[in-house]
Structures are given as structure tokens and as C-alpha cells.
From Swiss-Prot:
Swiss-Prot/TrEMBL keywords: Adaptive immunity, Cell membrane, Immunity, Membrane, Receptor, T cell receptor
Name the record gives this protein: T cell receptor beta joining 2-5
GO terms (BP aspect): adaptive immune response
Protein function: J region of the variable domain of T cell receptor (TR) beta chain that participates in the antigen recognition. Alpha-beta T cell receptors are antigen specific receptors which are essential to the immune response and are present on the cell surface of T lymphocytes. Recognize peptide-major histocompatibility (MH) (pMH) complexes that are displayed by antigen presenting cells (APC), a prerequisite for efficient T cell adaptive immunity against pathogens.
Organism per entry: Homo sapiens (Human)
Gene Ontology cellular-component annotations: T cell receptor complex
Subunit structure: Alpha-beta TR is a heterodimer composed of an alpha and beta chain; disulfide-linked. The alpha-beta TR is associated with the transmembrane signaling CD3 coreceptor proteins to form the TR-CD3 (TcR or TCR). The assembly of alpha-beta TR heterodimers with CD3 occurs in the endoplasmic reticulum where a single alpha-beta TR heterodimer associates with one CD3D-CD3E heterodimer, one CD3G-CD3E heterodimer and one CD247 homodimer forming a stable octameric structure. CD3D-CD3E and CD3G-CD3E heterodimers preferentially associate with TR alpha and TR beta chains, respectively.
Main location: membrane
Intracellular or extracellular location(s): Cell membrane
């Protein structure tokens, strides 16, 4: 599981 941040207040969880 990792969390990628694309910008302020924006994140994508990849399980």
C-alpha cells in the first residue's frame, strides 16, 4: 500500500 500525492489536498491510495 502506498500513497501518492499529486498536489495539495490531493492523494491517491494504491492498495
Amino acid at each position: 500500500q502506498e500513497t501518492q500525492y499529486f498536489g495539495p489536498g490531493t492523494r491517491l491510495l494504491v492498495l
